[in-house]
Amino acid sequence: SGRYDGGYDLLRQERVTQAEKLGVIPEGATLANYEPLATPWNELSLEQQRRYSRAQEIYASVLEYMDMSIGRIIDYLEETGQLDNTLVLFASDHGGSASESGVDPAASLRDTVNRDNSFENFGRPMSYIDHGEGFAEAATAPFRDYKATLSEGGLRAASFISYPAAIPGGDVSHTFLSLM
């Protein structure tokens, strides 16, 4: 049993609840105007659920590794006395990817040529997988849709700025930011 075996609908609700607790979105925020584009989790076959769940576990582990690596840089800056005078800017790519690569064998011929997307090879060399539409929708909660759409889920992305010498920490800003 994996962390994401409950599916993307459950994960979406968990993320909204956590975002409320952290003050990122107002308490009592709803998933208004949310019309899931992905097949409901309970309508997927057990094999489909297994593939999507495993792909999401791999995706999450990549993010966890990135987070740990950024932490190592921050730790180094702190240990060497440079953190207070260093501007740290992190910006995520827009929206969650809805690609079905690897999880849906019919997704694209391009995703299967010279690939081994067997379940046993997920996340290993020669695999080319993504976590699919449902987990992309969960990734952008509480917003609607995902990457490549003109909705908040496709346009908004997480970011943070830290510059202890000039910016007080601990605040959440909803100010529009563009890196273009």
What are these regions (language model features)?
Residues 28-29, 99-100, 153, 170:
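Short helix/loop capping segments that flank catalytic or ligand/cofactor-binding pockets
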Residues 26, 82-88, 155:
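Loop/turn elements at helix/coil->beta-strand transitions in domains of secreted/extracellular proteins
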Residues 1-3, 9-44:
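Long, well-ordered, tryptophan-enriched scaffold segments
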Residues 6-12, 17-21, 48-86, 96-98, ...:
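A long, amphipathic alpha-helix that forms part
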Residues 2, 74-75, 112-180:
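Substrate-binding rim/cap in mid-to-C-terminal beta-strand-loop elements of soluble/periplasmic
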